[in-house]
Amino acid sequence: MGQLMKEYRQQQKKRRADKNRKKVYVASRYAGDVKTNTQAAIHYCRFVIKKGLMPIASHLLYPQILDDNKPADRELGLAFGLALLGLCDEVWVFGPVSRGMAAEIEEAKRLNKPLRCFKEVGV
């Protein structure tokens, strides 16, 4: 029974550590070459994970639910993304800045979020 409790405590400790990881909002291009940009965003999220942090990439989530070709849906997705950005500890920007990314950068500055900019990382 002692070993079982030890394993349980270790699992609980790991869950708490995972839950308390810093959250990083990943800002990168989506529109245009969607397939290439999606693959790049996935790569950037993996980069964040390798740094021991939790990536939040709204542009990998909301296009699955909303139609990015409909202006109202696109605006809603951007608004949801900015709301998620507010929950994050930092904002990391990857590659050239698009119009949507510029709005994310402005929101990060408004909220005094630490902002890190990267060239395209190993895509």
Per-region residue spans from a language model:
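Catalytic phosphate/metal-binding cores of nucleic-acid and nucleotide-processing enzymes, i.e., regions
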Residues: 1-123
